[in-house]
A protein has these predicted regions:
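Conserved ABC ATPase signature
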Residues: 157-161, 165
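The feature captures the beta-strand-to-loop junction immediately N-terminal to the Walker
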Residues: 56-58
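Helix-to-loop junction immediately C-terminal to a conserved catalytic motif
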Residues: 71
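ABC ATPase NBD coupling module
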Residues: 88-104, 134, 249-252
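Conserved catalytic motifs of ABC-family nucleotide-binding domains
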Residues: 178
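Catalytic Walker B motif of ABC-type/P-loop ATPase nucleotide-binding domains
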Residues: 182-185
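Conserved ABC ATPase "signature" region
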Residues: 87, 134-153
Length: 286
């Protein structure tokens, strides 16, 4: 055993490398929602501290499932998810509560409370998870809204804001507790070009200013390539096609990588879901 490794005292074959600068480690993780379909198969990934890492891939390849495993929503069928050297145990509620205070989540559709004001949406985690006095919460909320350019919208209702503004409000809420890890699930979905540019700039700026680690799940190649330190390309079944810097992936000659980053319709990734021939399904096969 390496002197900077901690291994399972029970004698199984896993070890955690304490010399690693990874905040999150996905260690031989296999997961499926039922026994008939495996979403992630023996997945190994490391998300480095202080970096923006984007995970790109086609729909259904397991990107959002990966976030759920990191957040302790689901337990891996095999393998381990490690957060800052600590193996996540979904059955340990005290641990989950403690670890979740250290992460922020921007959901794909915002998940804002429509009956609350912008201010109260951002204040919600501070009121629920801390004992801070209301005057201090007031100042924190205004600072977080100012960081996303919406301090002036604090008293608006959610029904009064645009989709792009709602995404920024959700981001302000996600960073309310100053998380070490910020996870973004499709942060650019449904945004116009200007709002998309604003969202991308915010992700990069907040990461650099706060020193957080950011994990971005997305289909949007140009935005992710512009803001990421590291990019992971996944395929169906949780298979890692490639990973590297944005420049390395853009220069790749691998046909599957080229097809995805260039949005080419023809290539190794097929349009049709596996099926019998159309002639067989229509009963006209010869």
């Amino acid at each position: 055993m390496h002197p900077l490794q901690v291994c399972d005292p029970g004698g199984s074959q896993w070890c955690i490398d304490l010399s690693s600068d990874a905040l999150i480690e996905i260690d031989h993780v296999t997961f499926g929602y039922d026994s008939s379909r495996t979403i992630l198969n023996d997945l190994n990934l490391r998300f480095m501290r202080g970096q923006v890492t984007s995970v790109l891939g086609n729909s259904g390849c397991g990107k959002t499932t990966l976030l759920r495993l990191i957040g302790g929503v689901h337990a891996a069928n095999k393998g381990r998810v490690v957060f800052d050297g600590e193996v996540i145990d979904v059955h340990n509620r005290e641990q989950l509560y403690r670890l979740r205070r250290r992460l922020g989540m921007l959901f794909q559709f915002g998940a804002l409370f429509t009956d609350l004001s912008v201010y109260d949406n951002v204040a919600f985690p501070l009121r629920e998870m801390t004992d801070l006095p209301e005057p201090l919460i007031h100042d924190i909320v205004l600072m977080k809204l100012n960081a996303v350019g919406l301090r002036g919208a604090a008293q608006l209702k959610i029904a009064e804001v645009s989709g792009g503004m709602a995404r920024r409000i959700a981001l302000a809420r996600a960073i309310a507790l100053d998380p070490e890890l910020i996870m973004y699930d499709e942060p650019f979905a449904g945004l116009d070009l200007i709002s998309m540019g604003v969202a991308a700039k915010l992700i990069r700026t907040l990461n650099d200013v706060t020193g957080a680690t950011s994990l971005v799940i997305s289909h949007d190649v140009p935005e992710c390539m512009a803001i990421s330190d590291w990019v992971v390309l996944m395929a169906t079944g949780g298979r890692i096609v490639a990973q590297g810097t944005p420049a390395e992936l853009m220069a790749s000659t691998d046909p599957e990588v080229r097809q995805f980053v260039r949005g080419e319709p023809d290539g190794p990734v097929k349009f049709h879901y596996p099926a019998a021939t159309i002639e067989e399904d229509l009963g006209v096969a010869r």
